[in-house]
């Protein structure tokens, strides 16, 4: 989603992209850990909960803790969804809801 990553670029950050797993389209947490090992200067994780289907949030939060990362979750595609009874958007240090035509929420 460009509306998830463009604000980072516009504010001088350099994103490091990782792939998703199939068929669930979740963030590939093995690739996240590999990227963190390859580049320890990475300071945060930002991703959107695709189709309201979150990755293993327990593992995400452990990665965040282990690497002292900032975690920003974009709930543009996950409004109303939960992980283990906890609403998406309540895990990260910051929660956003980006708007674009292909997301569940949009603006004119």
Where does each model-flagged region fall?
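Active-site phosphate-binding strand-loop segment of PLP-dependent enzymes
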Residues: 25-107
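Substrate-binding/gating loop at the entrance of the active-site cleft, primarily
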Residues: 1-16, 20-29
């Amino acid at each position: 989603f460009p509306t998830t990553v463009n604000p980072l670029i516009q504010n001088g950050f350099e994103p490091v992209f990782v792939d998703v797993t199939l068929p669930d389209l979740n963030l590939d947490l093995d690739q996240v850990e590999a990227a963190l090992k390859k580049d320890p200067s990475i300071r945060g994780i930002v991703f959107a909960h695709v189709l309201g289907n979150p990755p293993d949030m327990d593992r995400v939060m452990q990665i965040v803790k282990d690497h002292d990362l900032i975690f920003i979750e974009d709930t543009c595609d996950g409004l109303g969804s939960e992980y283990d009874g906890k609403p998406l958007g309540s895990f990260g240090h910051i929660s956003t809801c980006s708007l674009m035509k292909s997301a569940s929420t949009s603006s004119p």
